[in-house]
Structures are given as structure tokens and as C-alpha cells.
Amino acid sequence: MQHPAEHSPLGKSSQYIAEYSPELLFPISRTSKWAELGLDGANLPYQGVDYWNCYELSWLLPSGKPVVAIGEFAIPADSPNIIESKSFKLYLNSLNQTVFASWGELQATLARDLSAVAGKPVAVRLRSLTEVAGEGVATLPGQCIDELEISVTQYAHPQPELLRCDASRVVEESLHSHLLKSNCPVTGQPDWGSLVVQYRGAALDHASLLAYLVSFRQHADFHEQCVERIFLDLQRLLQPQSLTVYARYVRRGGLDINPYRSTEALRVDNARLVRQ
């Protein structure tokens, strides 16, 4: 079956347009991947957001002087569409030789265009380099599981059967790993990520979680669907009172993608990690 991104700019030679071109944005419906995971878009078992951070954002003032900034975009996890990443990059590059009278005008333009393609309101925040530089680099909450001893032989597809828990013990804990890797389903390029699991429920075996995450290593899927698959596999196993799965991926093409899925109200810390 042809992947819905096959008609996107991914994996194709592209002309870089330097003047405002919102038509470059390419939507990819979430519906087919939701169906693959047994989800109904009208009744999702989580709340969430996809945080995109742009480090290659520039435009012109009326004087012709360039401005640079860092852009933060929050796309609702229940939006009908994701925005294909290369088309997002091409769209942002089309702002390079475009005049905007103010930061506010650009922010409103970005929010309008991205919301139209995603199918739900997208929150946009533009930040100065000085503001972001003052925040430094964050660390993930909880215990890192990457030094645990595991044995792994299969990497082609996620293996939820590796996950184990102790149903006789209920715990509340935060775990994280920097060993998440999957591949772009169109180009095959590697996607490197760090992942947080926060939950209250049956005690999860930490080594089994690490082995499970490593089983994604050759799996081909987008960032958002990988996080949703992890959320659902953990939810089925743990039957938790609360569960949050949050991944922060290494940037490509000046963009990083950070999907967040939770049973709880959104409390997202969009703080950059050392690899971002």
C-alpha cells in the first residue's frame, strides 16, 4: 500500500522558494495510522500536542533588514492532519525574502496557514535568540534506564510482547531513555529521539521497557505514530491510573518534533535537550 506521504516533497528534489508560499505546506491525514492502531479520532484515549521547534526562521523588515528568530509550533494531537516535515521546512524557507511589518504580523500569518493545513488551531510563539539562549539545556525527569543490561536480536518492528510488569505492585514513577530510534517511512532516514514515560500503575519492568524501545530501531513510521504506539502498548499492559509518553527528537532540516500523549491535562515543558 502506498504511504500517504508518497505524494509529499519527502525524498524528492525540491526547488527552494524564497518568497511567501503557503501552498507548499502538505497535510498528511492521521486517520489511516489511527485506524492501524485501532483508534477512533473522535474518541482518542489521550490528550496531546506535537511541539515543533524551528531554528531556521528568518524574514525581512520593511527596511530590508533580515530578522532571525526561533519558532515554536503546537499542533493538537487530535488534529485531522499532521504537516509533512519537508513541506514545513520549504514553507518556512519561503519567508526568507518576504517582508513583514512586525513579529506579530508574521506570527498571525504562521498561525493562520498552519491551522488551515492541520485542520485545528495551531499555537505559534516566536522567540529571540537571546531569550532562548538564556534557558540552557534541559534534562529529562526521572530515572534513566539506558545502562540496564538487555539482550536484543530483533529490530524490524516494535515488540510489545517484550514488556513486563508486576501487577501486584502499584507505583508512580518517571523513566526515560535516549536510545529511541526509528526510520522515516518514506526516505528511510534515521530519526533519533529521547523518551519519557511517566505513569501510576502496575510496576513496569525497566529492562523490558528498554528492550521494547530498542525494538523500534528499524521500524518505519513518523514520530507521532511511534509515540502513540508506545502509549497504547503501555496502556494495555499497565492499565494505569495515569500515563504520559513524551518524546523529543533530534532536529532535521532545522526542525525538531516532540510528540506528547497523556491521560492527564497537558503540562508540557518544551525545553531543549542536549542533542537538540
Swiss-Prot record:
The listed locations are: Cytoplasm
Pathway involvement of the protein, from the record = tRNA modification; tRNA-queuosine biosynthesis
| GO BP | queuosine biosynthetic process; tRNA modification
What EC designation does it have? 1.7.1.13
Q: Where is the active site?
A: 184, 191
Query: GO cellular component annotations, sorted alphabetically?
Result: cytoplasm
Enzymatic class: oxidoreductase
Pfam families noted in UniProt: QueF, QueF_N
Predominant subcellular localization, coarse grouping? cytoplasm
- InterPro entries, per database record: GTP-CH-I_C/QueF (IPR043133), NADPH_dep_7-cyano-7-deazaG_red (IPR050084), QueF (IPR029500), QueF_N (IPR029139), QueF_type2 (IPR016428)
| Keyword set includes Ribonucleoprotein | no
Q: Which GO terms describe its molecular function?
A: preQ1 synthase activity
Looking up PANTHER family in the UniProt record yields: NADPH-DEPENDENT 7-CYANO-7-DEAZAGUANINE REDUCTASE (PTHR34354:SF1)
Please state what the protein is called: NADPH-dependent 7-cyano-7-deazaguanine reductase
What organism is this sequence from? Ectopseudomonas mendocina (strain ymp) (Pseudomonas mendocina)
